[in-house]
Design a protein with these regions (language model features):
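Hydrophobic alpha-helical signal/anchor motif
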Residues: 10-14
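Low-complexity, intrinsically disordered short peptide segments enriched in small/polar/basic residues
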Residues: 7-8, 82
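RNA-binding basic/glycine-rich loop and surface signature characteristic of RAMP-family CRISPR effectors
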Residues: 22, 26-312
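Short linear motifs in low-complexity or flexible loops
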Residues: 5-7, 20, 24
Length: 312
């Protein structure tokens, strides 16, 4: 579930169904399905599926979800200007940070002098990073190079925030034993013909994640646009389609529920809207093993004035 409010300057927003750039934004919720896979590994527990130890409910971190979104955007927008990814594998962050200095013609050793000559240097650097990196524009970032240089742009708060995903019902992770015919060493090959291993699975689980989009922050800080928002929805719906692996082969986003407000700061608290969304087991189902075992509903009759519900 996401909350989005509308900003007067959402960049180049096209009209859809009578809405314009001045429209508000929505809250949204996503339903995430896991079938015989590991949705999120817990390094503190031997890489078993992450759970709340007191209740048994499954958890997936916001960091995991944002990683999937970043990977999707990088895949579909490969090489396209303005859609680079700041947090990525094998790329030191300060290398990307230095690009802003190069663009503005600033030597890293002379940042203090540049600050004296340019009062708005912080804003220029922030705008450069937001313009070029989609994930900074979306989620914000802590850019340590600028923090160390005592620039105010080192910490950017993004308009999009995600919560942990939590399973609708408690989960029962299973550890299964597997064998392989390949032997690791020649010495082992003389003693045995196979090797044993273990892996964790979750037979089935439906997870619910909630998130927020602030049009106010998008307008005032990062320039997150309507086109960026549409790409975010596309990424949430399809992020597992470009991330298949033996551990994640049947994971999918089942539905995205959006609460759209007609004012920039919103017409109702997010929690009241999220409470309108129910995911419940169907009558007679004791052990869910498919999405059809659940009924997902929204009490649209209870929507506050100025809030629209969109189901994707």
């Amino acid at each position: 579930i996401f909350r989005e409010t509308a900003a007067p300057q959402m960049v180049e927003r096209h009209q859809h169904g009578g809405h314009t750039d001045a429209d508000p934004a929505p809250e949204r919720q996503a339903g995430r399905e896991v079938d015989e896979r590991v949705p999120g590994r817990d390094p503190d527990s031997g890489n078993m599926p992450r759970i709340d130890p007191e209740t048994g409910y499954g958890l997936v971190t916001d960091v995991c979800l944002k990683r999937k979104i970043r990977n999707y955007v990088e895949t579909v927008k490969e090489g396209e200007s303005g859609y680079r990814i700041y947090i990525k594998d094998n790329v030191p962050l300060n290398r990307s940070d230095r690009e802003a200095y190069d663009y503005l013609g600033i030597e890293p050793a002379k940042v203090a002098d540049a600050k004296k000559k340019k009062e708005n240097l912080d804003i220029e650097i922030r705008d450069f990073m937001c313009k070029n990196f989609y994930d900074i524009r979306t989620f914000g970032a802590v850019m340590t190079t600028f923090v160390k240089d005592k620039l105010n742009c080192g910490q950017v708060r993004g308009p999009v925030q995600l919560s942990f995903a939590k399973s609708v019902d408690p989960i029962m992770p299973q550890e299964v034993t597997i064998t392989r015919v390949a032997i690791t060493t020649e010495a082992d090959a003389e003693k045995k013909g196979t090797e044993m291993g273990r892996k964790y699975i979750v037979p089935y689980a439906l997870y619910r994640a909630e998130g927020y989009v602030s049009a106010n922050l998008a307008r005032k800080t990062t320039g997150f646009s309507e086109e960026d928002l549409e790409l975010l929805w596309q990424a949430i719906m399809n992020m597992f389609e470009v991330d298949h692996a033996a551990a994640r082969g049947k994971m999918a986003t089942r539905e995205l529920i959006v609460f759209k407000h007609d004012s920039e700061l919103g017409n109702a608290p997010a929690y009241k809207l999220f409470d309108l969304v129910k995911a419940e087991r169907r009558e007679g189902v004791d052990t869910p093993r498919a999405y059809s075992d659940y009924n997902v509903s929204v009490d649209e009759a209870a929507l506050p004035s100025g809030v629209e519900c969109i189901r994707i």
